[in-house]
C-alpha cells in the first residue's frame, strides 16, 4: 500500500527501467490504475479524462502504459478515440513521462524542477543523456540554475577540474554574469583572473580555453584603448552594428533652407510657445540631420522641443513613430505629444523563443518599420542589444531622434548607449541646460540639478514638494506616512489619497510594504 501511495513519484522511474517487468501482476496493475485514473485523468495527458482512463485500463489492464507509450494506435479500439486522438494521447503521454524522468534527475541532483519543461522542449527525450554527457548545458542564463549548482553536478558526474568544457563554461558564465551587471565586455586579464578564482584553475589552462572559445567565435577579443576586450559574440555584433548604422546615419543630411525657420515660427504660434535658442536649434537640427541627440535634465524643456519636432515632421509629410523603453514612458509621451507612442518591444513585435530562450523581434532588415522618422524618449534606459534591434528595424534613410537625460541611471541591460554616444562627439547633439521658470518652482527639479552640481539638496522646507522627515521609531514612521497620505498631502497639494504612491525599500518589518499597505488601506 505504501508503494502504491507513492506511485505518483515512483512510476516514472519504474517505467524507465526493467524493474517494472519484475513487479507482481497485481501490484503492477494497482500502480497503473492509480497513475491512469488519478494522474492522467487530471488532464496532464492531453485527450484523457477519468472516464477514458478507466476504459483504457479495463481493456488493456497491466499493458495499458506500454500500449499508450509505444502502440497508441491500439487505443482506437475504444469507442470515441479516433486515430488522430490516439496519436495525440501517445505523444502527450511520452512527453509527460519524459518530463517526469527529467524532473526526477534534476531532483536527485538538487537542481530546480522549474528547468524540466524548458530542457525537455529543447532536447526532448535525450535531455537526461545530454546533460549527463555535457552537464554545462545547464549553465544557461534562462534556466535559473546557478553556476555553482551546475559545477557541483559536473564534478559528481566525473568531470575533471581542468576539463576544457568546465573551464570554457566558467569563462562564459563570467561574461554572462558581467553582461547582466551592465558590462558589454571585460578586459582579458580580469576575465582570466575571475575565472581562475571561480573554479580554481591555473592561468595557462584558462588562457587556452579562452583561445578555444575565440577560435569558435563564441567569444570575440579585440584591442580597446590599452586593453584586450573580451566580448560575448552577440554583444560584439550588436556594438559593431550600432556603431556602423549610426555612423552611416550621420552622413544623411537634408538642405531645408530658410523654409524650416518659417515652419518653426508657425509651430511656435500654433502651440503657443516661444522656443529658447537651444530648443529652436534642436528642432532645426532634426529637420536637417539623419540622427540627432537631444539631452537635458528635468525642467529643461525636452518635451516642448519634442512636440516641436513631431509637428515639424508632420509638416514635412514624414510618417513618424514615437517610442519609449517602458509602458509608463510611452503613455506619458502620448499624452504630452498628442500622438500615439509605443514601447520599443511592442513596436518591433517582440516574441520569446522557448527552445533557445532568446528574445526575437518580428521587425528587422527583412520586414522594417513603415516609418520615415523615429523619435525615442528616455534613451538612458535603452541597452545595447535593444538599440541594435531598433536600428535593424529601420530602413536606410529613416531619421532618428534620441531624447534623454544622461544623468539618469544607465540601462539595466548591458551598455550605456546614451552616455557613450554623447561622449563620442560624433552624433549631432543639442543639450538643453536652462531650467524654465515654471519648472524652477519645483524643489524636486531644483534638487536634481543641485545634486548634479555636487551641492546638498534642500531638505527642510516642508512647504515645498520635496522634504525630509526624520522619525526614530518605526511605529511613529508608519503613523507619519498615514497622516501624510490621508490628511497633510491631500489638503496641501490637492491630491486625492488614491493618487499618492508610497515606496519602501523592504517588504517585511514594521516599515515594509506589507504592513504599510495594511495601515494605509
Which role fits each region the language model picked out?
Residues 204, 220-373, 422, 428-437, ...:
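ASCE P-loop NTPase motor cores of helicases and related translocases
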Residues 292-295, 401, 501:
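Short hydrophobic/aromatic beta-strand immediately N-terminal to the Walker A/P-loop
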Amino acid at each position: 500500500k505504501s508503494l502504491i501511495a507513492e506511485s505518483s513519484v515512483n512510476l516514472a522511474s519504474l517505467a524507465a527501467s526493467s524493474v517494472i517487468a519484475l513487479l507482481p501482476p497485481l501490484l503492477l496493475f494497482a500502480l497503473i490504475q492509480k497513475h491512469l485514473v488519478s494522474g492522467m485523468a487530471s488532464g496532464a495527458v492531453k485527450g484523457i479524462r477519468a472516464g477514458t482512463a478507466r476504459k483504457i485500463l479495463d481493456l488493456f489492464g497491466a499493458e495499458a502504459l506500454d500500449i499508450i507509450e509505444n502502440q497508441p494506435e491500439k487505443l482506437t479500439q475504444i469507442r470515441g478515440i479516433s486515430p488522430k486522438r490516439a496519436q495525440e494521447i501517445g505523444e502527450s503521454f511520452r512527453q509527460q513521462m519524459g518530463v517526469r524522468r527529467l524532473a526526477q534527475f534534476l531532483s536527485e541532483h538538487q537542481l530546480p524542477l522549474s528547468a524540466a519543461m524548458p530542457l525537455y522542449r529543447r532536447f526532448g527525450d535525450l535531455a537526461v543523456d545530454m546533460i549527463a554527457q555535457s552537464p554545462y548545458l545547464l549553465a544557461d542564463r534562462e534556466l535559473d540554475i546557478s553556476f555553482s549548482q551546475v559545477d557541483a553536478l559536473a564534478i559528481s558526474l566525473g568531470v575533471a577540474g581542468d576539463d576544457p568544457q568546465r573551464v570554457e563554461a566558467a569563462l562564459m558564465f563570467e561574461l554572462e554574469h558581467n553582461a547582466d551587471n551592465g558590462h558589454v565586455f571585460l578586459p582579458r586579464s580580469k576575465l582570466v583572473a575571475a575565472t581562475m578564482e571561480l573554479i580554481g584553475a591555473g592561468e595557462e589552462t584558462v588562457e587556452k580555453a579562452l583561445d578555444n572559445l575565440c577560435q569558435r567565435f563564441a567569444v570575440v577579443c579585440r584591442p580597446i584603448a590599452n586593453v584586450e576586450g573580451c566580448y560575448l559574440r552577440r554583444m560584439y555584433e550588436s556594438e559593431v552594428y550600432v556603431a556602423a548604422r549610426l555612423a552611416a546615419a550621420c552622413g544623411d543630411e537634408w538642405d531645408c533652407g530658410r523654409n524650416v525657420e518659417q515652419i518653426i515660427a508657425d509651430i511656435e504660434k500654433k502651440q503657443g510657445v516661444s522656443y529658447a535658442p537651444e530648443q529652436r536649434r534642436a528642432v532645426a537640427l532634426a529637420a536637417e540631420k539623419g540622427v540627432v541627440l537631444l539631452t537635458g535634465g528635468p525642467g529643461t524643456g525636452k518635451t516642448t522641443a519634442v512636440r516641436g519636432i513631431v509637428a515639424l515632421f508632420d509638416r514635412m509629410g514624414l510618417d513618424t513613430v514615437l517610442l519609449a523603453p517602458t509602458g509608463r514612458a510611452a503613455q506619458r509621451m502620448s499624452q504630452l505629444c498628442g500622438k500615439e507612442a509605443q514601447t520599443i518591444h511592442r513596436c518591433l513585435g517582440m516574441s520569446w523563443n522557448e527552445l533557445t530562450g532568446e528574445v526575437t523581434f518580428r521587425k528587422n532588415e527583412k520586414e522594417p518599420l513603415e516609418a520615415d522618422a523615429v523619435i525615442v524618449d528616455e534613451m538612458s534606459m535603452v541597452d545595447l542589444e535593444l538599440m541594435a534591434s531598433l536600428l535593424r528595424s529601420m530602413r536606410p534613410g529613416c531619421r532618428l531622434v534620441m531624447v534623454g537625460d544622461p544623468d539618469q541611471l544607465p540601462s539595466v541591460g548591458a551598455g550605456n548607449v546614451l552616455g557613450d554616444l554623447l561622449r563620442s562627439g560624433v552624433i549631432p547633439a543639442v543639450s538643453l541646460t536652462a531650467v524654465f521658470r515654471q519648472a524652477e518652482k519645483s524643489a524636486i527639479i531644483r534638487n536634481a540639478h543641485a545634486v548634479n552640481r555636487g551641492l546638498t539638496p534642500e531638505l527642510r522646507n516642508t512647504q515645498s514638494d520635496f522634504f525630509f522627515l526624520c522619525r526614530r521609531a518605526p511605529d511613529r514612521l508608519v503613523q507619519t506616512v498615514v497622516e501624510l497620505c490621508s490628511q497633510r498631502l491631500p489638503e496641501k497639494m490637492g491630491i486625492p489619497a488614491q493618487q499618492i504612491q508610497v515606496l519602501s525599500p523592504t517588504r517585511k518589518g514594521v516599515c515594509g510594504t506589507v504592513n504599510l499597505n495594511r495601515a494605509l488601506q
